[in-house]
Structures are given as C-alpha cells and as structure tokens.
Amino acid sequence: MTREFKFETLQLHAGQTVDPTTKSRALPIYQTTSYVFDDTQEGEDLFALRKPGNIYTRITNPTLSAFEERIAALEGGVGALATASGMAALTYTILALAHAGDHVVAASTIYGGTFNLLKETLPRYGITTTFVDIENLAEVEAAIQDNTKLVLIESLGNPLINIPDFDALAELVHAHKIPLISDNTFATPYLINVFSHGVDIAVHSATKFIGGHGTSIGGVIVDSGKFDWEASGKFPQFVDPDPSYHDISYTRDVGAAAFVTAVRTQLLRDTGAAMSPFNAFLFLQGLETLSLRVERHVSNAEKIVEFLAGHPKVEQVNYPKLADSPYHALAEKYFPKGVGSIFTFNVKGGEKEARKVIDSLEIFSDLANVADAKSLVVHPATTTHGQMSPEDQLAAGITPNQIRLSIGLENVDDLIEDLRIALEQL
C-alpha cells in the first residue's frame, strides 16, 4: 500500500490488489497445484529464487500470499509464512533455529501441546528444553547455555493468562545473541504489537482469533526482520550458502526476511505442512473483522470476570486485568486494550465440582478450542494439559478444580445467567 494505514484499514486491505483479469473486488481462491511458466528461462529463474513468483502451491499460492502479507502488515513484520496448523508453525520455527545438539529455553506455563513437543518429541531429534519461570529473569539467565538457540514464550499464557515482562526479557535474551519467540495466538496483533517490545518472531494458531469461527485449522509465522543473524554468530544456516538452493545466502541475498524465507524454502519445501488456499481465504475473511470481534470478546469477558470474582462458589479467577492479579501492572503496561477473552477460574472443591459446573452449562460448548465466536469451556487438567504429569501441571498453574472459558460474542447477560445456573448446582 502506498502510505501508512491504521490497523482497522490494514485488516481489510493489506496484501490484496484487484484481480487483473476479472477485476474481482473479493480475493479469489486460487485452488490450483501449480503455475505455467512463460518460458524455460522463467522456470529456471523461479526455481533459483532469482525471480519472485509461484511454482507450486506447497511453497507459494496467491491466496496464501495475500493472507501472509496481511498478517505481516498487522504484526509489523517483514514477511510471514502460512502453515497447515499452529503446531506446524511453532515446530518449523524451532527446527529452523535449533538442530540436533541444540537447546531451547521455554516458559513452563505454556500450552500442553507445545509442552509435549518440547519435552517428548524434539528430544528424539537431539533438541532439548529447559522449562523456566519466565517471570524470574535470574532463572531464565541461568537456563541459557552456549548451545541455546531461542527463548520461547506466550504473549498471554495458556491457560493461566500470565504475562511476561517483554522489554526486560528481550534485553536479557538479546544479550546472549539469540532470538525471543512469542506465541501471540491469545493476544492477537490487535491487542499487542510484540515486535515493538523486543520479540523477534511471532507465531499464531490462525485457527483461533484470526479465523474466529472455528471452521479452519492453520498457523502462521511472522518475521520481525530485526534480529541480526550475522552478528549473532550462532546461526550459520541463514548466513552460509545453502547448497539446496544454488548456494543462496539468506542474509546476503534476501536481507531482513532471511529467517522466514529460509523456513519456506527448506522446511516447508521439504516437509510440506502447507495451508490450503481455501483455509487461507477463510482466514482472510476472519481478519477483516478481527478488531471488531476482539473488542466484543474483551468486553464480554471483563463483565463475566467481574461476575465470577464476586461469586461465593468461585475460589479464584485468573485474569490479569483484576486489581489483585499478580500480572495487573504488566497488563496495564502492555495490554491497554484488554487481555483477551480466554481465562481460567477455580471453583471451590476439586475435580468433581469442576466437572459438574462444565456439564451443567447450556450455551458454552465443552471442546478443545478457543477464540471462537461461540463461547467454549474445557477442563484443562484432563484435556488440553492432560498429558502432563501432576508435577508439571502444578508448575504450569493447572489444578483439578480449574475451568477454562473462552468467551464468545453472544449476549453477555445470557452467558452470565448460564454460568450462574451451573454454579448453583454445587
């Protein structure tokens, strides 16, 4: 676009130009596998990365490119890569940075699927992880080793909604010449611009707020373009010639978007966790109303939090905007627009009581997703974080009497009444 625009304008227009053939205002779904070369020279140039363009939809596609450009614009990054799922985006990010013999530092209060990837799956390939209290900077510092290649956090933790001190953490991590990675799924780029607080790479499960309607699985990696891979000295894979692509050097030949380009031309090319054009189209539809939806999500959530915090059957509500939350000051600093609509609360009692409340709800759907237009509920200890040991659950702040809510776009009075009736069953 020719000049700088605000978020609400970018979410509707960034990454899209009018289709030159049909003049369609809506973005077409380019449901194709491959693309015709003008001549043999163009084919050679495209494969050698000497010319931008489309070769095969596993690597690039016009519908996906529009989605990637739009989310990059909303995050303030230099480039993005769409993937088949949020876990694919996270896995690609880690595998691009860390190889066999390398090490990761990660927040202990992260999504159960991410925890399992780091603790159980990646060690089989020689990548180990130390889980830390991300709020304890001394503990983070002590965990970083010579072979540590990244520090991984969540902008809003899942499911505790804990908030890292981004600025302080980024300063510490960058002193060790490694990047700070943040899963920005729960926050969205509308509630926080993580790149302005020192994060180098953001990942999303586009399945959540970006799509917004629980219809599509997808993920996306966004590159800030700010990390200096050459000066770091720890990432030769982005600096040295790549023999699989005619000895291209990503830092020399691509520049600021070196990281995200390398992920596309190596990991996506070779392992193929590509987003479908149809899903990209649905995610673009979701982005058009992202700010409006998130505002309503937040408004509903804050009213429900207020109700639950005053209920006699509720032991605790974990929501950073509450005055007594340990994250209240960080919420005020980093999240002036709100801290989203996903949070947990603990009922008085144990697992039996938590299950009874969940099973008594009528509007809330009991399922393992969040950030849908519809309100959702789940019991983290037995579902999303059920693969974790009791000790690991405790370290992540998960207890048997805890319930996670994802507040949707329904009338908030109806949602409060649904919760009131369910809590009366205790």
Question: Which residues does each predicted region cover?
Answer:
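PLP-dependent enzyme catalytic core of the Aspartate aminotransferase-like
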Residues: 119, 128, 146, 293, ...
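Active-site beta-loop-alpha junctions enriched in small/polar residues
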Residues: 156, 185-187, 322, 348, ...
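Conserved PLP-enzyme active-site core in the AAT-like
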Residues: 2, 11-13, 17-20, 80-309
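Conserved small-domain helix->loop->beta segment predominantly found in fold-type I
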Residues: 271-274, 278-280, 285, 289, ...
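Short hydrophobic/aromatic beta-strand micro-patches
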Residues: 222, 344-346, 406-408
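N-terminal "arm"/small-domain region of PLP-dependent enzymes with the aminotransferase-like
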Residues: 2-61, 69-70, 403
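Conserved N-terminal alpha-helix of the aminotransferase class I/II PLP-enzyme fold
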Residues: 39-88, 113-121
